[in-house]
Regions:
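C-terminal lobe and adjacent flexible extensions of AdoMet/dcAdoMet transferase-like proteins
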Residues: 205-264
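Conserved class I S-adenosyl-L-methionine
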Residues: 1-48, 53, 57, 141-172
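A short glycine-rich, Lys/Arg-flanked "PGG" loop and its adjoining helix->strand segment in the class I
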Residues: 126-138
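Acceptor-substrate binding/catalytic loop of class I
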Residues: 119, 182-196
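A short acidic, Gly/Pro-enriched loop at the edge of an enzyme's catalytic core
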Residues: 100-110
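Class I SAM-dependent methyltransferase SAM/SAH-binding core
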Residues: 53-98
């Protein structure tokens, strides 16, 4: 856990989601999908809020927002941003696996857009989903993001060829983990799922998936082109992407996937 906190200490998640079109696509797609459930007055809890790129937006939309973040430095940044924007957000430093400060059946929506990238044991993943089930009202919504292990293997081939070793790829494909000392710390503290595995996790914990989409589609593979779009071209590409991101054949190759599910 200390290594994970260190990974995100000093990380600028806001810039990551806005500095390039390829990352902006992730944010815009996620907000487009979540917007269907974020009417003013809705109670929304984000587990793994980082510096608040999403939680602050939810509050600006009129939602009653509770934000939980593991890394203390990120909590401080989010707190200051909320204060500067005069937004009322209930903010807690904590682990997505245990949020006792959030009341049972108190939330209309629970958003988990980062923790499942890093919960490396099956027990932890189930704990996080059980906490989501506990705090969400019956019939409420959970939104869960994950990183595809199949995409990560492709990223290694493209950017980190020194990791193309039998033992690295076998571990990644069989467990979703990367323990090789040559790997960047992000990968060593990560957990990378498969679309089927994440769906199973959600179903096992009392949710019914209603939508499963490829948040990035295949755009990461053509990042150089996407990042050099004009604003008009980006808008056109975004609209095309939003029409195709539910295509199941794109799920494994997309960097991020997103599942929307209802609490049974």
């Amino acid at each position: 856990m200390e290594e994970l906190i260190a990974q995100y200490t000093g990380a600028d998640e806001d810039s990551r989601l806005t500095r390039q079109y390829i990352a902006q696509l992730e944010y815009d797609t996620t907000m487009h999908v979540l917007g269907n459930y974020l009417q003013p007055g809705k109670r929304v809890c984000e587990l793994g809020a980082a510096t608040g790129r999403y939680s602050l937006k939810f509050a600006q939309m009129g939602c009653d927002v509770t934000a939980v973040e593991l890394a203390p430095e990120q909590v401080k940044i989010l707190s200051q941003k909320a204060k500067d924007a005069q937004l009322d957000i209930k903010l807690f430093q904590g682990n997505a696996c245990s949020v006792p400060f959030v009341a049972d059946s108190s939330q209309d929506v629970c958003v988990i857009l980062g923790p499942l990238y890093h919960l490396q044991t099956e027990e932890e993943r189930h704990q996080a989903m059980q906490e989501a089930k506990r705090i969400v009202k019956p019939g409420g919504i959970v939104a869960v993001a994950y990183i595809s292990r199949f995409f990560v293997a492709g990223m290694f081939a493209q950017k980190f060829p020194k990791l193309i070793k039998p033992e690295v790829l076998s571990e990644l494909l069989e467990t979703g983990l990367v323990s090789d000392s040559d790997a960047d710390s992000f990968f060593r503290v990560g957990y990378f799922s498969s679309p089927a595995e994440i769906e199973s996790l959600i179903i096992q914990n009392g949710f019914e998936p209603i939508r499963h989409l490829a948040t990035d589609g295949f755009s990461r593979y053509i990042a150089n082109g996407v990042n050099h779009f004009t604003p008009a071209q980006y808008d056109t590409w975004l609209q095309n992407h939003l029409q195709t991101c539910d295509e199941s054949s794109l799920l494994g190759s997309s960097n991020h996937g997103l599942i929307i599910a209802t609490r049974i």
